[in-house]
Every structure is written in C-alpha cells, then in structure tokens.
C-alpha cells in the first residue's frame, strides 16, 4: 500500500507537469496523510492539464458524500476494472496523476513488532507521479466532494524487501506515459500500470518521527 508521501509545492508541480489551470496554493508537505487534500493533475475536456486539490481517500459517486467505512486511499490494480468502488471512475476515464517527491513504507523488523520507516525516491525522476483515480460524490447538503486514490500493485524486488509483509507498491508512471494515462482509452491506460524498476529506486531509512502525521518538516527525510 501507499499511505504516506512527500508532495512538492504548487510551482514545482506546475513546471513539471506543464499545467495551464490550477485551483490551489500550498507549500510542500513532508508527511502527506490520508483524508488530507492533496494536489492532483487531471486532463480537461480540451486536453489541457489542470491542477486541483482533492480529498485523499476515494468517495464513490454513489456514496452520497460519505466516506466508506473501508480504506479507499489505495486502489489495487487487481480490482481496478471491476471492483465496486473503482469500476465507475475507471470506466468513465477519471484518471489522475498524484505528484510526489518520494513516499514512505515501513519494514517489519526481526522481532516481528517494531517497524523501521523508509523513504523511497527515484534516481531518474526528481518529481514523479503516482497513477490515480478520482471521483465526485454529492452529499445530502448538495455539496460535491472530489476525492482520489493511488493505484497499487505487486512489489518489485526492492519494495518486497522494504514492504516485507504485504509486498505492495504504488504504481509510478514513466514520464513518457503521463499523457496517455490522463487521456487514453481505459484498455490502453491499463497497460501503463507497470512495476517501476527497482534499479531506479532508492530506499533510505529515516526517523520514526514520520509515524506521527502532525510531524511535517524536512528533517523527516534525513537518513538515520
């Protein structure tokens, strides 16, 4: 799974993803956590890339604005096309890119109880994008809530060693696949969900301060 990550500031995202319209202003976050509003990149009907901040934890359109009781921060690739929560936005082409500088995963230690957090980055993309889905759900008060989820998949070798219980990792898009992920037909988009090569990933042990979401500063990504 992917439950915590580092997000760039709005100017960096606008440059990296060539955005033409945005609805945001925010600093970088070193400890993005579920239920927070997170920056995402989407394609408008005219094809232009736009940015917005969405609730992290997908609320399906049929949920009437109420967060499901089960976790929806990650959409497993195995259920992407037919799972009750995901198939609607998938078939409607509601795909997005969730920009990141890196993400955190926890490695269970030899005692079977303690966990060591690791910070994962790429050595070929400073700012990269998770493959995501988004949806809009209107509550009883008539207010629409836009929300998103990160697609996850079986881990590569490095992530198997770090995320050593569930063996999962987020789907990270190759730079050349970003446009197609946003605009292609679902069948083509599905082929873009690939294991990112572990040779292009770096895992760094970091402080357990990251365990607490209220801790949010650059020291969280300093090696220990």
Task: Label the model's feature ranges.
Residues 1-224:
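Short linear sequence motif anchored by a di-proline
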């Amino acid at each position: 799974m992917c439950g915590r990550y580092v997000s760039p500031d709005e100017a960096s995202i606008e440059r990296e993803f060539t955005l033409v319209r945005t609805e945001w202003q925010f600093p970088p976050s070193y400890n993005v956590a579920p239920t927070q509003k997170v920056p995402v990149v989407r394609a408008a009907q005219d094809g232009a890339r736009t940015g917005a901040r969405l609730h992290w934890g997908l609320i399906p359109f049929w949920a009437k604005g109420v967060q499901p009781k089960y976790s929806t921060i990650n959409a497993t690739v195995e259920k992407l096309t037919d799972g009750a929560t995901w198939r609607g936005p998938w078939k409607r082409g509601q795909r997005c890119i969730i920009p990141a500088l890196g993400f955190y995963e926890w490695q269970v230690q030899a005692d079977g109880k303690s966990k060591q957090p690791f910070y994962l980055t790429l050595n070929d993309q400073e700012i990269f994008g998770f493959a995501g889905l988004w949806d809009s759900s209107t509550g009883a008060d008539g207010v629409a809530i836009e929300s998103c989820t990160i697609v996850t998949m079986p881990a590569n070798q490095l992530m198997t060693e770090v995320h050593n219980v569930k063996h999962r990792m987020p789907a990270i898009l190759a730079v050349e696949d970003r446009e197609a992920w946003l605009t292609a037909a679902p069948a083509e988009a599905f082929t873009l969900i690939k294991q990112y090569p572990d040779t292009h990933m770096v895992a760094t042990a970091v402080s357990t301060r990251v365990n607490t979401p209220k801790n949010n500063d650059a020291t969280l990504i300093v090696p220990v």
